Amino acid sequence: MSDLLTKRSVADIQHLIWLSLGGGSTECIPNVSYGFFREKGMEADLVYITPYGYLHEFEIKRSKSDFLADFKKPVFHGDVRIQKLTFVLPEALAGEWLKQWCADHYKEFRRSFDFWFYPEEGMLKRPRHYGADPKCKYDLEYYFTDEMVREIDENDRDLPYRRRLFAEERSALYRLCMIRFWNNPRRVEIKTAPKEQSIGLFENADEGKGEK
């Protein structure tokens, strides 16, 4: 029995992330596999190339079980090019359950990360960098106390030093992005689809093969 908490597709959520990062020429590449990453079994639902040349990885989850399964993997987003990791979760997971889960398991976290949340309609809800409220379930301070952050940061420091992408690595990601586009049977709809409709680059023939 499915425990999905959303009707939104992975492609739709990828599109929301792209829009939230600025849309337009924002450098986002969907569905990056172990062919690019050096660690066996590692893959990313979406990576964003930051203005400074690092990678920001987004892990999209559509159910509680899929989110929990990520923390049982032997490989946990440790590629040296990933500067930041974000879990993009259904809004239904925001709140007391996730807060208690973080409190119970933070000593096991192998690196720092944050949460973004998506509702069934509308745009992503992102944590505030300024004016964050520990009582707001969309801000990180709601989930992590200062003590928890310090301990997680200690684990984070054990990871290899992060580095910027080399030119050939950026080129490899651009090629992958083009493959995703031209292998998309619905690419012709991009020109006519409403701006907020999530089709095109972030939708591919593999959609639906696995639950997230």
Task: Indicate residue ranges for each PLM-predicted region.
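Acidic-basic catalytic patches of nuclease active cores, encompassing PD-(D/E)XK
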Residues: M1-M42, I49-T50
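Non-catalytic C-terminal interaction segments of nucleic acid-processing enzymes
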Residues: D3, L19, A103-K212
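Helix N-terminus capping/helix-initiation residues
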Residues: S9, S63, L165-F166
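A generic local structural motif
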Residues: Q14, D45, D70-P74
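Active-site-proximal helix/loop capping residues that flank conserved catalytic or ligand/cofactor
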Residues: H15, H56, Q83, Q197-G200
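Catalytic cores of nucleic-acid endonucleases
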Residues: G23, L55, K61-E121
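Short hydrophobic-acidic sequence motifs that mark active-site Asp/Glu residues
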Residues: E43, V47, L55-E59
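Short hydrophobic/aromatic beta-strand micro-patches
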Residues: V47-I49, V88
